[in-house]
Regions:
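Central cavity-lining transmembrane alpha-helices of secondary-active solute carriers
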Residues: 86-105, 313-326
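Cytoplasmic membrane-interface "Motif A"-like loop-to-helix N-cap segments
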Residues: 108-120, 331-346
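C-terminal ends and interior cores of transmembrane alpha-helices
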Residues: 121-137, 344-365
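Glycine-rich segments within core transmembrane alpha-helices of 12-TM secondary carriers
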Residues: 155, 175-201, 410-422
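Extracytoplasmic gate region of multi-pass secondary transporters
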Residues: 60-65, 266-321, 385, 389-390
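A late C-terminal transmembrane helix in Major Facilitator Superfamily
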Residues: 189, 399-434
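Hydrophobic core of transmembrane alpha-helices in multi-pass small-molecule transporters
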Residues: 126, 140-156, 365-385
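C-terminal membrane-cytosol helix-exit motif in multi-pass small-molecule transporters
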Residues: 201, 232-253, 455-463
Length: 472
């Protein structure tokens, strides 16, 4: 009686220490004996690294609200200073999106082990640099801008993590694996916004960095070590970078740069890009802008004004949690219908914000409603983030390599969310407050609703309706 040949064990599959010699996740025998163990180990390590990536990428969103308080001013006029702070928060998004375009092509060229390890360790540069900048009085704006661009490395490598993970898992588990990794990775946004107000109050690195700064608040002055916001993840980056180098392996799917350009000939690459800008672009954009948006709209009402970081972390926390949970739901229901519902929900939130006046407040009375509506927006972005990543491998099921690259490419374009949202909101607030007018973010949210409507229409026509071109 013939027997199935034994699948290679872990060591045989990674005989050269980097590239796996064989990878067949769709083969039940291989998956049960070897593939599952390697894939889940890879998912664990790369997800931890991705959490740190998001934490560093959104570092300035948590730091910017306190820079003025310690005496860091880039303009004498408060309105101009706020606008410059919004641009500072936007820069990691600009760099992150651009670097994601590059990362889209890196896994087939260099493999998971090299790309993830190097990108993890590179983030040490901006973290140490930001700590130095806040400890050095008189650091010019251009240096902060350069460091902000370098923080974009934390956003750029997402487009290597996602294609890598999709290659390690069989199609039936891709939605779950991608949802777990992206969702838990997104927790890095909440982590940095939650940890910052706590750790800057501790002399955790004082032996190395020296004394505190004086932070002026509406209720007085307090001592803070603002550099700690950038330093807490430094030892973690070193540790996880070393572990990734020792433990990760690479799937033997290689393609030249020229071969990989074929994804741009498929119209569905561009349609997927639009729907992911709606979901992840909005999640990352609002996550970056939320603290400064709270400060700009509701920070001018005296001692009772809300502390932005007491609320800002809740949005990314909800969006990240929902993304993880709805990854499982999308595997059962399909992604297209959930993307449709998420987009409709986001449009509804924009309409509610426009109708209730929370975007142009004249008192703190509307602040609770504003927070609840923003949390609702994060909820729907989380649903959409999970569902779209379930859709894309199915839309490109005919070519797994293309499907993996589309995950990277869509993530690259959507990573411009922090740049586009922060810059656009900052300019909108500056424009509406000219000549003594009330600050308002209403024009931005009207434009966002129009774009969401366009994305929902594309998703319905090509992926959701009966008889659509590529059901997903």
């Amino acid at each position: 009686m013939a027997t199935e040949p034994a699948a290679p064990n872990d060591q045989q599959a990674a005989s050269n220490g980097d590239w796996l010699s064989l990878w067949k996740p769709e083969d039940p025998v291989f998956w049960a004996s070897t593939g599952s163990r390697i894939a889940w180990r890879t998912l664990l390590l790369t997800t931890i690294s991705l959490v740190l990536s998001f934490s560093t990428w959104f570092l300035l969103s948590a730091l910017a609200v306190n820079l003025t308080g310690i005496g860091v001013k880039f303009a004498e006029d408060p309105k101009d200073n706020d606008r410059l702070l919004f641009w500072l928060v936007a820069m990691p998004g600009l760099a992150g999106g651009t670097l994601r375009v590059i990362h889209t092509f890196m896994i087939p060229l260099f493999g998971t082990r090299k790309v993830i390890t190097v990108s993890t360790l590179l983030k040490l540069i901006p973290c140490v640099g930001i700590a130095w900048a806040v400890m050095t009085p008189g650091t010019p704006y251009w240096i902060y801008m350069v460091l902000a661009l370098l923080l974009g490395m934390g956003g750029g490598d997402f487009s290597s993590y996602m294609p890598s993970t999709s290659l390690f898992f069989p199609k039936r588990l891709q939605g779950t694996a991608l949802g777990i990794q992206a969702g838990i990775g997104n927790f890095g946004v909440s982590l940095t916004q939650f940890v910052t107000p706590w750790i800057i109050g501790l002399a955790a690195f004082a032996a190395v960095t020296g004394g505190p700064q004086g932070l002026k608040t509406p209720t007085g002055e307090q001592s803070v070590w603002l550099q700690n916001a950038a330093l807490w993840c430094v030892p973690l980056l070193i540790i996880i970078g070393a572990v990734c180098w020792m433990q990760l392996r690479s799937v033997p799917i290689k393609a030249s740069f020229r071969e990989q350009l074929d994804i741009f000939k498929d119209k569905h690459t561009w349609f997927c890009t639009i729907t992911y800008v709606m979901t992840f672009g909005s999640f990352s954009g609002f996550a970056a802008a939320f603290p400064m948006l709270i400060k700009s709209l509701y920070g001018g009402f005296g001692p009772d004004s809300p502390k932005p970081l007491a609320y800002a972390f809740l949005g990314p926390l909800i969006g990240s949690t929902v993304r993880v949970l709805f990854g499982f739901v999308a595997d059962k229901t399909g992604g297209a219908i959930l993307t449709q519902l998420a987009g409709i929900g986001m449009i509804g939130i924009c309409v509610a914000m426009a109708a209730t006046g929370v975007l142009a407040p004249t008192s703190l009375e509307t602040f609770p409603l504003f927070v609840w509506l923003m949390l609702g927006m994060f909820f729907f972005t989380g649903v959409g983030n999970a569902s779209t990543f379930r859709q894309y491998p199915l839309i490109f099921a005919h070519n797994p390599r293309q499907g993996a690259q589309v995950l990277g490419w869509t993530g690259a374009v959507a990573a411009y969310g922090p740049f586009l949202f922060s810059a656009a909101i900052g300019e909108t607030l500056g424009w509406t407050s000219q000549d003594g007018g009330v600050k308002s973010a209403l024009p931005f949210f009207i434009a966002a609703a129009a774009f969401y409507l366009f994305a929902v229409a594309i998703n319905w026509y090509y992926y959701s309706r009966n008889g659509c071109e590529r059901p997903s």
